[in-house]
């Protein structure tokens, strides 16, 4: 199953009502679609980036999105990806 992951889902500057889907302890400031793509590939998932897309509630910000082939729940995958993005920034 293909899951779409928008950078907003992992953004610590966004509230839950604005689209963040992970707890603040996992969220990062201004994540990019390319960081999410690298994290998904690190988890050995089939993933592709669509850089010309914008998150519908904030259509004026062209943030891009990542499409991931994953058979589990999105709510299980997002914290894993967020942790990898966060740890890659600490290096």
From Swiss-Prot:
It is found in: Cytoplasm. It comes from the Archaea. GO terms for cellular component: signal recognition particle. Pfam families: SRP19 (PF01922). InterPro entries: Signal_recog_particle_SRP19 (IPR002778), SRP19-like_sf (IPR036521), SRP19_arc-type (IPR022938). SUPFAM superfamilies: SRP19. GO terms for molecular function: 7S RNA binding. Transmembrane segments: none annotated. Keywords: Cytoplasm, Ribonucleoprotein, RNA-binding, Signal recognition particle. GO terms for biological process: SRP-dependent cotranslational protein targeting to membrane, signal sequence recognition. Gene3D superfamilies: Signal recognition particle, SRP19-like subunit. PANTHER family: SIGNAL RECOGNITION PARTICLE 19 KD PROTEIN, SIGNAL RECOGNITION PARTICLE 19 KDA PROTEIN. Involved in targeting and insertion of nascent membrane proteins into the cytoplasmic membrane. Binds directly to 7S RNA and mediates binding of the 54 kDa subunit of the SRP. Part of the signal recognition particle protein translocation system, which is composed of SRP and FtsY. Archaeal SRP consists of a 7S RNA molecule of 300 nucleotides and two protein subunits: SRP54 and SRP19. HAMAP family: SRP19. Belongs to the SRP19 family. This is Signal recognition particle 19 kDa protein. The gene is srp19.
